[in-house]
């Protein structure tokens, strides 16, 4: 079985929880999931990872299921050049999208995270996503034949996705996810 290198160690995750929530946890209260070399958009993966960070596991799964059903979008904060900006669209974001393929892959990863947490004996209702990251993976080389015997490189990008969740005490677990609305 390959050994994956997470960008966050258990000690760093415990320190991150203490800084944000003021609670000391042990490495046994941390669950991780990693999906290497996923064939999906890196930019959309970064936006989804940024959005689900801070949610409980149940909240993130519910939101991403709504994205797959095209009911609720994901806000786009970084990669928004040449995208449609709306006056007051979905709950105050000027740019939002429905990255269905990315949401399906993240749902599979969240399912993996939930199973890892159950295996460690953690309470799934109290799991909060404290770290989510998407890193560029390898490029799968490909070529597109062109006219007059030419060829153009047509590479496929891959993404390495990691999610870290921590089991927090009930009084610290966020009841409802607060959305960061854009002030105009």
UniProtKB/Swiss-Prot annotation:
One of its GO terms (biological process) is cytoplasmic translation. Transmembrane segments: none annotated. The keyword Cytoplasm does not apply. This is Large ribosomal subunit protein uL22. Belongs to the universal ribosomal protein uL22 family. This protein binds specifically to 23S rRNA. It makes multiple contacts with different domains of the 23S rRNA in the assembled 50S subunit and ribosome. SUPFAM superfamilies: Ribosomal protein L22 (SSF54843). HAMAP family: Ribosomal_uL22_A (MF_01331_A). Gene3D superfamilies: Ribosomal protein L22/L17. Keywords: Ribonucleoprotein, Ribosomal protein, RNA-binding, rRNA-binding. Part of the 50S ribosomal subunit. GO terms for cellular component: cytosolic large ribosomal subunit. The gene is rpl22. NCBIfam families: PRK04223.1 (NF003260), uL22_arch_euk (TIGR01038). GO terms for molecular function: rRNA binding; structural constituent of ribosome.
